[in-house]
C-alpha cells in the first residue's frame, strides 16, 4: 500500500522538503493525499472551505511569502504556516511529515489498522488457512493465476484466529471489539455486531436470541424469508401476520395503515392465541421491513408510537436501507435516531452493508438500541445476544470482510458520510429528470405533480431536501397503492424505480399493449448495464455514492435506445441476440413488439398483478393448518410427498415457496396451497413454457420436464394415515 501524497497549490513557494510524492491540488480529489499546502491567495479564494467541507480532516498548511500574514480567523482551521525561508525547508518538511503520518494513521480505523500492521510483520504461518498467505496456490499454475488476479495482500490478510494478536471476532475482544464500538457510535446504536454471512444470518441471530415456542411475533408479510426461517422454523414462534400492499406495476409496498391500530391487532391475536389477546404487551417481537426491496420507506417514529407499547422489541429489518440517518430528509425514518424511554420497545436493526453501503458481499451488521429498558425482564443482555451470534458465526471468519465493515463505519463518520449520500441523492434526482426529459414510455416512479407543478420543474437542490417530492399521498394515481395514511410512506430517493408501459395509471388496469420489464432488463444486460431486479412492469436500479452522472447518462442513453427500437419494432434478433440465439426456433421471425405483446397478454390473461396483490392481503392469505415449525419437522422426517402444482391444491405446504428476487414467501410451511398463490405459480409455470429464456428463479418448488413440458412440483405434507404407515417402516 503506497503512501499518501502531498497536495500543493501551484502558486505556493518551494518552502519544504518531503520524500512523499507531490501533486498539484487541482489534480487531486483529496482521497489520495495526507496533507495539503495552500497559498494565502487559495485560502481567501475559498479553497480551505472546500477542503473543510469534505469532512476528511486533512491537515492544511499555508505557505506565505513576502512577509504575508495569515488572517486570524483562519488559524484555528489549519495545522501550520510555512514561510519562504531556505534554512527552514527541512524543518517544515518534518512538520509536514508528522501531520501527514498522523492523518494516515487515524484514517485507518482500528481493526483495519491492526490488520495492516499484522500482515506487515511478515509472520511465518503454520496455522489455518492452509494456503498460508497464498503460497499453496502458487504451487500450481491455476493457483498462481488466482493469486495474481486478486493480489497477494488479500491472501496475506486471510488470517487464522490462532494468533491472539488480532483479537477475537466471536467474543469481541481487542481490535474487533473497538471496531464494533466505533460502528455503534457512528450509527447511533448502543452496541453493534459485525456479521459476515449476510443479513439472512443477522436476522436469525436476533430472532434466535429473542423468540421461543409460543411467543407471539408480529410479522410483516413482506418479510424476507430469513425472518420466517429464524422466527418461525427455528424459534417456533407464532406469527400474527400484517397485510401489505402491492401495486399494479409489481412494486412491493408497505403495511396498511389500519394494521397499526391496537384494536385491530388484538383481533388478530384473538384468532391465533385468544388467551393472549388482552395482555398489556402481547408481542415478544415485531419484525418490520424499514424499507422494502422496492423502496417504500417507513417512518420509524410512527411505527414505535403506534405499536411500541404492545411489543417487547421491534426488529427493523433494514437490509435495503441503513443510510437513512445520513440523508437529512430521511432522518425521521431512522429507528436509531429515536429518543426512547423505559416504556418503549427495545430496538434492533439489521443492515445489509453489502447492498447499498460500502462492504463486500455478505457483510452485515446488527445494531442494538435498548439501554432504555435495561434492568427490565424483557431486556436481552449482550451475553444472550452473543450466544445466538456464535450459533450462526463461523469459527473461521474471513478477516477482509470484517475489515470492510470497519472501513464502512469510518467512511460514514461525520460530515463525509452525509456529503457522500447527498451527492447520491442529487445524482438520482438529475437522472430522473433526464429520463423525464428524454423518454416517452419509461417513467420514473415519482409524483407527476407537486403543488400543481411538474416534479422535474423544481430545482434539484430543493427536491434533495424536501420529502414532499417522494411521498406517497393517499389516493394519488401515480403510485396506485391502497390503504396508506398521510405521511406514512415515501419513495427511497436512492432507489431508481422505473415503470414500463402496460398499466393505466388512472385505474390500475391493463392496457391493450405493454412492455414487461423483464424484456427491458434483458436488453440492458445485453448492453452492459445490470439492473438490480424487475417484476411485471417495474424495474429497479440501486443508487449509492459510487454513482456518477457519466454512469447514469449511459443508462439513460440505453433507455432512449430501447424506446427507439420499440417504436421501430426492431427484429428480436437485434434487440436480444443472446436469448434469440438460445431459442431461435421458438422466436424465429419475432419482433420486439411481438414478444412484448405476447408476454403482456399472458400477464393480462392471468391478471398477474391482481394475484400478486391478493397474495399479501389478509382476505386471501393461505389458510394455516399447522405451525410452520411443525410443518418443517414433518418435511425433515420425510412425512411428505412431491406432487404436481395442480395436485397441491388443498394440501399443506411443507416448504415455503417464492420467486427470487425478492425473496418474500408467498406460501409458508404449514399453510394450505390454493387460491391466489396457486394461481400465481400456475401463471409462472405457463410463462416458463410459453416464453423460454425469461423463466424466473423459483425457490421451494421444483421445475421438472415431462413429455417436453416443464412442470412445477412441490412438497406437501402426507395425510395422517399415510404418515402412520411410514412410521411403521415404509421407505421413501
From Swiss-Prot:
GO molecular function: ornithine decarboxylase activity; protein homodimerization activity; pyridoxal phosphate binding
Signal peptide: none
Top-level taxon in the UniProt lineage: Bacteria
Modified residues (N6-(pyridoxal phosphate)lysine): 355
Entry GO terms, CC: cytosol
Catalysed reaction, written as an equation: L-ornithine + H(+) = putrescine + CO2
Pathway where it operates: Amine and polyamine biosynthesis; putrescine biosynthesis via L-ornithine pathway; putrescine from L-ornithine: step 1/1
GO BP annotations, alphabetical order: cellular response to acidic pH; putrescine biosynthetic process from arginine, via ornithine; spermidine biosynthetic process
Activity response to pH changes: Optimum pH is 7.0.
Coiled-coil stretches noted in the UniProt entry, renumbered to this chain: none
Annotated keywords: Decarboxylase, Lyase, Pyridoxal phosphate, Spermidine biosynthesis
Expression induction or repression: Induced at low environmental pH (at protein level). Part of the speFL-speF-potE operon. Expression induced by ornithine (at protein level).
Cofactors, names only: pyridoxal 5'-phosphate
Listed SUPFAM superfamilies: CheY-like (SSF52172), Ornithine decarboxylase C-terminal domain (SSF55904), PLP-dependent transferases (SSF53383)
Annotated Pfam families: OKR_DC_1, OKR_DC_1_C, OKR_DC_1_N
EC code(s) of this entry: 4.1.1.17
Gene3D superfamilies xref list: 3.40.50.220, Aspartate Aminotransferase, domain 1 (3.90.1150.10), Orn/Lys/Arg decarboxylase, C-terminal domain (3.90.100.10), Type I PLP-dependent aspartate aminotransferase-like (Major domain) (3.40.640.10)
PANTHER family given in the database record: CONSTITUTIVE ORNITHINE DECARBOXYLASE, INDUCIBLE ORNITHINE DECARBOXYLASE
Family, per entry: Belongs to the Orn/Lys/Arg decarboxylase class-I family.
Function in brief: The first enzyme leading to putrescine and thus polyamine synthesis.
NCBIfam families noted in UniProt: ODC_inducible (TIGR04301), PRK13578.1 (NF010092)
Name the record gives this protein: Inducible ornithine decarboxylase
Lineage: Bacteria, Pseudomonadati, Pseudomonadota, Gammaproteobacteria, Enterobacterales
Amino acid at each position: 500500500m503506497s503512501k499518501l501524497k502531498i497536495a500543493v497549490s501551484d502558486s505556493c513557494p518551494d518552502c519544504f522538503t518531503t520524500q512523499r510524492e507531490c501533486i498539484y491540488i487541482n489534480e487531486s480529489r483529496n482521497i489520495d493525499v495526507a496533507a495539503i499546502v495552500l497559498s494565502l491567495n487559495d485560502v481567501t479564494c475559498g479553497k480551505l472551505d472546500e477542503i473543510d467541507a469534505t469532512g476528511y480532516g486533512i491537515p492544511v498548511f499555508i505557505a506565505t511569502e513576502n512577509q504575508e500574514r495569515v488572517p486570524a480567523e483562519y488559524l484555528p482551521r489549519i495545522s501550520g504556516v510555512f514561510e519562504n525561508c531556505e534554512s527552514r525547508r527541512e524543518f517544515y518538511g518534518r512538520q509536514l511529515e508528522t501531520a501527514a503520518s498522523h492523518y494516515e494513521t487515524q484514517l485507518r480505523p482500528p481493526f483495519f489498522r491492526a490488520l495492516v500492521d499484522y500482515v506487515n510483520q511478515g509472520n511465518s504461518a503454520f496455522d489455518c488457512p492452509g494456503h498460508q498467505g497464498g503460497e499453496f496456490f502458487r504451487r500450481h499454475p491455476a493457483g498462481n493465476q488466482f493469486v495474481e488476479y486478486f493480489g497477494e495482500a488479500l491472501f496475506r490478510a486471510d488470517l487464522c484466529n490462532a494468533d491472539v494478536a488480532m483479537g477475537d471476532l466471536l467474543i469481541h475482544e481487542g481490535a474487533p471489539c473497538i471496531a464494533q464500538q466505533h460502528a455503534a457510535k457512528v450509527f447511533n446504536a448502543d452496541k453493534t455486531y459485525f456479521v459476515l454471512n449476510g443479513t439472512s444470518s443477522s436476522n436469525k441471530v436476533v430472532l434466535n436470541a429473542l423468540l421461543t415456542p409460543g411467543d407471539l411475533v408480529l410479522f410483516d408479510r413482506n418479510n424476507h424469508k430469513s425472518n420466517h426461517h429464524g422466527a418461525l422454523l427455528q424459534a417456533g414462534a407464532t406469527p400474527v401476520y400484517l397485510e401489505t400492499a402491492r401495486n399494479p406495476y409489481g412494486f412491493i409496498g408497505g403495511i396498511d395503515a389500519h394494521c397499526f391500530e391496537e384494536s385491530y391487532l388484538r383481533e388478530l391475536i384473538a384468532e391465533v392465541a385468544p388467551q393472549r389477546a388482552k395482555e398489556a404487551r402481547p408481542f415478544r417481537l415485531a419484525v418490520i421491513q424499514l424499507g422494502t426491496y422496492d423502496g417504500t420507506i417507513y417512518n420509524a417514529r410512527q411505527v414505535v408510537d403506534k405499536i411500541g407499547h404492545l411489543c417487547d422489541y421491534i426488529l427493523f429489518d433494514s437490509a435495503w436501507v441503513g443510510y437513512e440517518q445520513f440523508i437529512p430528509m430521511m432522518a425521521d425514518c431512522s429507528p436509531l435516531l429515536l429518543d426512547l424511554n423505559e416504556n418503549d420497545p427495545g430496538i434492533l436493526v439489521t443492515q445489509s452493508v453489502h447492498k447499498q453501503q460500502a462492504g463486500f458481499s455478505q457483510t452485515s451488521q446488527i445494531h442494538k438500541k435498548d439501554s432504555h429498558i435495561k434492568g427490565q425482564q424483557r431486556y436481552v443482555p449482550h451475553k444472550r445476544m452473543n450466544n445466538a451470534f456464535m450459533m450462526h458465526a463461523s469459527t473461521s471468519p474471513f478477516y477482509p470482510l470484517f475489515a470492510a465493515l470497519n472501513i464502512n463505519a469510518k467512511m460514514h463518520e461525520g460530515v463525509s458520510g452525509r456529503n457522500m449520500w447527498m451527492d447520491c441523492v442529487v445524482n438520482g434526482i438529475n437522472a430522473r429528470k433526464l429520463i423525464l426529459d428524454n423518454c416517452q414510455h419509461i417513467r420514473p416512479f415519482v409524483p407527476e405533480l407537486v403543488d400543481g407543478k411538474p416534479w422535474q420543474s423544481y430545482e434539484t437542490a430543493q427536491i434533495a431536501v424536501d420529502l414532499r417530492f417522494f411521498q406517497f399521498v393517499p389516493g394519488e394515481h401515480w403510485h396506485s397503492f391502497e390503504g396508506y395514511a398521510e405521511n406514512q410512506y415515501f419513495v427511497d430517493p436512492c432507489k431508481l424505480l422505473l415503470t414500463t408501459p402496460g398499466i393505466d395509471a388512472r385505474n390500475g388496469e391493463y392496457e391493450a399493449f405493454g412492455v414487461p420489464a423483464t424484456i427491458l432488463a434483458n436488453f440492458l444486460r445485453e448492453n452492459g448495464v445490470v439492473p438490480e431486479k424487475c417484476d411485471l412492469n417495474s424495474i429497479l436500479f440501486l443508487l449509492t455514492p459510487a454513482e456518477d452522472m457519466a454512469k447514469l447518462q449511459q443508462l439513460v442513453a440505453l433507455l432512449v435506445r430501447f424506446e427507439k427500437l420499440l417504436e421501430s419494432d426492431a427484429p428480436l434478433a437485434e434487440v436480444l441476440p443472446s436469448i434469440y440465439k438460445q431459442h431461435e426456433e421458438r422466436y424465429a421471425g419475432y419482433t420486439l413488439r411481438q414478444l412484448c405483446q405476447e408476454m403482456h397478454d399472458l400477464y393480462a390473461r392471468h391478471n398477474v398483478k391482481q394475484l400478486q396483490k391478493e397474495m399479501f392481503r389478509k382476505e386471501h392469505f393461505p389458510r394455516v393448518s399447522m405451525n410452520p415449525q411443525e410443518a418443517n419437522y414433518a418435511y425433515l422426517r420425510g412425512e411428505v410427498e412431491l406432487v404436481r402444482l395442480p395436485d397441491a391444491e388443498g394440501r399443506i405446504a411443507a416448504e415455503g415457496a417464492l420467486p427470487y428476487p425478492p425473496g418474500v414467501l408467498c406460501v409458508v410451511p404449514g399453510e394450505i396451497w390454493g387460491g391466489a398463490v396457486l394461481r400465481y405459480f400456475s401463471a409462472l409455470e405457463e410463462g416458463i413454457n410459453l416464453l423460454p429464456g425469461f423463466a424466473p428463479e423459483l425457490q421451494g418448488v421444483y421445475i421438472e420436464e415431462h413429455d417436453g413440458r416443464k412442470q412445477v412440483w412441490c412438497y406437501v405434507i402426507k395425510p395422517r394415515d399415510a404418515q402412520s404407515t411410514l412410521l411403521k417402516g415404509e421407505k421413501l
